[in-house]
């Protein structure tokens, strides 16, 4: 997991790499787009904006082929992050959606969520899973970018 407090800090750290430069462009564009409509830049990423409630899940979610990048637009976003190896599988991985779901082992405590500030950026690694701490009716918008794990 990598957390940047602002898009400017993200740009300073990663904009020298083409796919991350495009990720920054996608985040900037997604703040002006209609909700729930996916777009792409090149062949390495897709992006869209959704209400935070659409990301809420009672399970941890992890991916194998894409980094998930989250950037809250209107309200801070609380995200629980754990290594997949510290979780128990809660169903089969779907190659179609590139999604695996996980649960806490032995009813462990959730711990403290990572809070992504408005305009901040959270990058999830393929070895991690996340659970968004939001209710299904949360309306704050979040930019979601899926970036291929190939290359860096």
Mark where each language-model region is.
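Short, conserved beta-strand element in jelly-roll/cupin
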Residues: 64-79, 83-86, 92-105, 147-148
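Short, surface-exposed beta-edge/turn micro-motifs
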Residues: 44, 65-69, 119
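Short glycine/proline-enriched turns and hinge-like loops at secondary-structure junctions
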Residues: 62-63, 136-138
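A short hydrophobic beta-strand segment most commonly corresponding to one strand
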Residues: 69, 121, 137-152
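A short, N-terminal "cap"/entry segment at the start of jelly-roll beta-barrel domains
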Residues: 1-50, 59-62
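Conserved metal-binding segment of the jelly-roll/cupin
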Residues: 113-135
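Short alpha-helix capping/helix-loop boundary micro-motifs
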Residues: 105-111
């Amino acid at each position: 997991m990598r957390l940047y407090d602002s898009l400017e800090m993200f740009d300073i750290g990663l904009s020298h790499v083409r796919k991350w430069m495009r990720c920054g462009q996608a985040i900037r564009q997604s703040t002006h787009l209609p909700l729930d409509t996916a777009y792409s830049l090149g062949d390495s990423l897709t992006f869209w904006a959704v209400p935070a409630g659409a990301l809420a899940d009672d399970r941890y979610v992890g991916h194998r082929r894409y980094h998930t990048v989250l950037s809250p637009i209107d309200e801070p976003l609380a995200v629980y992050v754990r290594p997949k190896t510290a979780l128990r599988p809660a169903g089969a991985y779907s190659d179609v959606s590139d999604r695996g779901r996980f649960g806490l082992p032995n009813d462990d405590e959730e711990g403290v969520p990572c809070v992504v500030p408005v305009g901040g950026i959270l990058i999830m690694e393929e070895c991690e899973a996340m659970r968004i701490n939001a209710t299904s009716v949360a309306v704050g918008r979040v930019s979601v970018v899926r970036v291929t794990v190939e290359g860096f």
